[in-house]
Amino acid sequence: MKSCEVNFDGLVGPTHNYGGLSYGNVASQSNSQQSANPREAALQGLAKMKALMDLGFTQGVLAPQERPDVSGLRRLGFTGSDEQVIEKAARQDMPLLVASCSASSMWVANAATVSPSADTADGRVHFTAANLNCKYHRSIEHPTTTRVLGAMFADAKHFAHHPALPAVAQFGDEGAANHTRFCRDYGEAGVEFFVFGRSAFDTRYPAPQKYPARQTLEASRAVARLHGLSEAGVVYSQQNPAVIDQGVFHNDVIAVGNGEVLFYHQDAFLNTDPMLNELRDKLGRVGGQLRAICVPRAEVSVQDAVRSYLFNSQLLSRPDGSMLLIVPQECQANASVWAYLQRLIADDSPVAEVKVFDLKQSMQNGGGPACLRLRVALNDTELAAVNPGVIMTAPLYETLTQWVDRHYRDRMSESDLADPRLLSECRTALDELTQILKLGAVYPFQLN
């Protein structure tokens, strides 16, 4: 049976703004309080989805969250009608309202960790929604994420859904942004690679000093247990605390993997050689051969990697066995990064081509191509069981671009978030979206 890896990209929500909410994410903080363009952001994301579909890749779409999060504001003590709740929050605690309007769910690499059926004990695809407990604006996402994923992957014969881990620092979980799977073929057993920033309970592991390490070893181990992964099919590796302190808040900012290839910066990991040996050995036992591409710090600094989001790229397998690297245009604008990429494709490397995309609206908020997608490896039977409404087609692309043009504003600043009309605009848009994507009732306003 054939298998493929499907990229489900996050659709940017109508409240996209530059709130500067993510301490440790350099781009997010440096662009704080600039005016954003939600319409342009959503269209840029859709253009990437359409382009990959046109290249022959199976492409899906993941719906945004309901924002402003009125129910969350009510839990924090604001009362009255929905409009009054927003008005009071704007008057009494504007930073909280900004957090409650975040469109950060667009970065669906943080939505969940996914293990394909070839790796799991029960032969189903497993999903665990990430608790994202490091930041309030992201910690409120997982209940809706769980419902949306449940509506997309509804057949319990093929798909298993786990609730988020306990929302405490010891089990901080950031989803697939710290998880990669290596395999010879998507339908064969592989090795799942979990990267953590610190250990909650074992003081032998170092930790960053400036910025928080968002993923714990304990969370990664818990997800592996929930998914029924064997020890022989899992490798845990610690991210270098020094690069976290330079703005590498997730592993997908400093490394990317696909198939048998790990593309990483020289400073990405602690204890790199033992990690590579374990990965090479375990992948070899399931018929694979690891190809590690190390980018030397002498050619690309960590600072340039973070500025350009070189590693927050998509590494995609083409039918001929070569790979395509999808990068943001910031890579082209960075001389050392672009020079390195030209050498990479000229050398005898698996990466045969680099394609550049304009994702400026997302990039300025701290998310590149890899942040915007959740990878799900599926065989033909499982793919047929996915809700067909979320698989990108030319007609769906046209429908969604028209939907964005109808409902999204072209400017969003902090003061706009207090506009009581924004709530009704967003709910009208999302109600229509659930019909377009055939999701049913997934949003709080639809369930109440």
UniProtKB/Swiss-Prot annotation:
UniProt-listed GO biological process terms: arginine catabolic process to glutamate; arginine catabolic process to succinate
Active-site feature positions: E174, H250, C371
GO molecular function, one term: N-succinylarginine dihydrolase activity
InterPro entries for the chain: AstB_sf, SuccinylArg_d-Hdrlase_AstB
Binding residues for substrate: 19-28, 110, 137-138, 214, 252, 365
Enzyme Commission number, as recorded: 3.5.3.23
Record-given protein name: N-succinylarginine dihydrolase
Species, as recorded: Pseudomonas syringae pv. syringae (strain B728a)
